[in-house]
Swiss-Prot record:
Region Disordered: start-end pairs: 147-188
Composition skew (Basic residues), residue ranges: 161-171, 178-188
Domain of life: Eukaryota
Entry keyword annotation includes Mitochondrion: no
Origin species: Caenorhabditis elegans
Keywords assigned by UniProt, alphabetized: Cytoplasm, Ribonucleoprotein, Ribosomal protein
Cellular localization per UniProt: Cytoplasm
Protein name as it appears in the record: Large ribosomal subunit protein eL18
Gene Ontology BP terms: translation
Primary gene name: rpl-18
CC per GO annotation: cytosolic large ribosomal subunit
Family the entry assigns: Belongs to the eukaryotic ribosomal protein eL18 family.
Gene Ontology molecular functions: RNA binding; structural constituent of ribosome
PANTHER family linked to this entry: 60S RIBOSOMAL PROTEIN L18, LARGE RIBOSOMAL SUBUNIT PROTEIN EL18
């Protein structure tokens, strides 16, 4: 008698539409679903996948990161594409001329990009400008930059773990002695 195969892990969950009720986001999703199907380009498939992602996975992107990407050799006249919010960066002294296609651009970032002679286009305008993703640079924000991510990983207290413990206080008596110094039992 055979053993039934366990199908517990067979299903891979993929979003078929954005979770958001935003009608503009849903229309963009439909547009890029069409483009991904008809062009067969990987660029459009990636845009579609990211349009359907949760906000938590579409982290904001600073103007400084955009500037760094544009200043790389060969990227001067390319359009920077990001499926998130572009935010201003006060540490950036001068903004180069940038062409950006993004879901949202903050007021400060928008003013600085336009003042530098750059352009900001929407993703439906990008679909008309480069339907196959030609002359574009893809960027995304750091997904693991959230404070909550610091608590994920090997358990705090095990050797070589840099995981942040959940503690009620950061005082002397709280996860500071035992296991942290040789004079108190052991040191990991």
């Amino acid at each position: 008698m055979g053993i039934d195969i366990n199908h517990k892990h067979d299903r891979v969950a993929r979003r078929t539409a954005p979770k958001s009720e935003n009608p503009y986001l849903r229309l963009l999703s439909k547009l890029y679903a069409f483009l991904a199907r008809r062009t067969g380009e990987k660029f459009n498939a990636i845009v579609l996948k990211r349009l359907r992602m949760s906000r938590r996975n579409r982290q904001p992107l600073s103007l400084a990161k955009l500037a760094r990407a544009v200043q790389k050799a060969g990227n001067e006249n390319k359009t920077v594409v990001t499926l998130s919010t572009v935010t201003d960066d006060a540490r950036l002294y001068t903004v180069p001329k940038i062409s950006v296609a993004a879901l949202h651009v903050t007021e400060g970032a928008r003013a600085r990009i336009l003042a530098a002679g750059g352009e900001i286009i929407t993703l439906d305008q990008l679909a008309l400008k480069s339907p196959k993703g030609e002359n574009t640079v893809f960027l995304q924000g750091p997904r693991s930059a959230r404070e909550a991510e610091k608590h994920f990983g090997p358990a705090p207290g095990v050797p070589h773990s840099h995981t942040k413990p959940y503690v009620r206080s950061k005082g002397r008596k709280f996860e500071r002695a035992r296991g942290r110094r040789a004079s108190r039992a052991y040191k990991n």
